[in-house]
Amino acid sequence: MAERKARVERNTLETQITVEINLDGTGKANFDTGVPFLEHMMDQIARHGLVDLDITCKGDLHIDDHHTVEDIGITLGQAFKQAVGDKKGIRRYGHAYVPLDEALSRVVIDLSGRPGLLMDVPYTRASVGGFDVDLFAEFFQGFVNHSMVTLHIDNLKGKNTHHQIETVFKAFGRALRMAIEMDERMAGITPSTKGAL
């Protein structure tokens, strides 16, 4: 099997980003973005998705976190799309329910080639440690638009905003892991009746 790795650089007047991803990794992660809470959440993707991530970003944090968070989502989506390749032999679909104390989230993903985000997370607070939680929708929208996946994110229960967000990211990592797994019965076959994704 060919290596499912990618390295993408994205430079704008607002952010300079490098993302390296290995879909067949062990969950190793290295981040230098200037946004610690986002890094904590992306670590959940790596560990629960068993993908290796190395992400660096120099962004206009003197304004706010918006451009940095959104552009990391965009660049991660580009790297993911490149690493997953032609999708032959993968499971394509993935889903996970993840609890953390009182919080419970469900994430379902389809590596469909059609970008779509449906996200319903009724945060109980507007920020966690100074981080604007609305920016997570920007992160996932950026990822979806550039990875060309359909993603459903639902926080089903939760009172602690940190727990709500953490269950979303853990479930996303686990759903991603399921979707990119190779299916021996589908070896060399594209998982679509159209023959292409």
From Swiss-Prot:
Broadest EC class assigned to this enzyme: lyase
Pathway: Amino-acid biosynthesis; L-histidine biosynthesis; L-histidine from 5-phospho-alpha-D-ribose 1-diphosphate: step 6/9
Record's keyword terms, sorted: Amino-acid biosynthesis, Cytoplasm, Histidine biosynthesis, Lyase
One Pfam family this sequence matches: IGPD
EC numbers, comma separated: 4.2.1.19
GO cellular component: cytoplasm
PROSITE patterns, per database record: IGP_DEHYDRATASE_1 (PS00954), IGP_DEHYDRATASE_2 (PS00955)
InterPro entries referenced in this protein's UniProt entry, alphabetically: IGPD_sf, ImidazoleglycerolP_deHydtase, ImidazoleglycerP_deHydtase_CS, Ribosomal_Su5_D2-typ_SF
BP terms from Gene Ontology: L-histidine biosynthetic process
Single annotated GO MF: imidazoleglycerol-phosphate dehydratase activity
Catalytic activity: D-erythro-1-(imidazol-4-yl)glycerol 3-phosphate = 3-(imidazol-4-yl)-2-oxopropyl phosphate + H2O
Subcellular location field: Cytoplasm
Similarity-based family: Belongs to the imidazoleglycerol-phosphate dehydratase family.
Protein's UniProt name: Imidazoleglycerol-phosphate dehydratase
Organism: Marinobacter nauticus (strain ATCC 700491 / DSM 11845 / VT8)
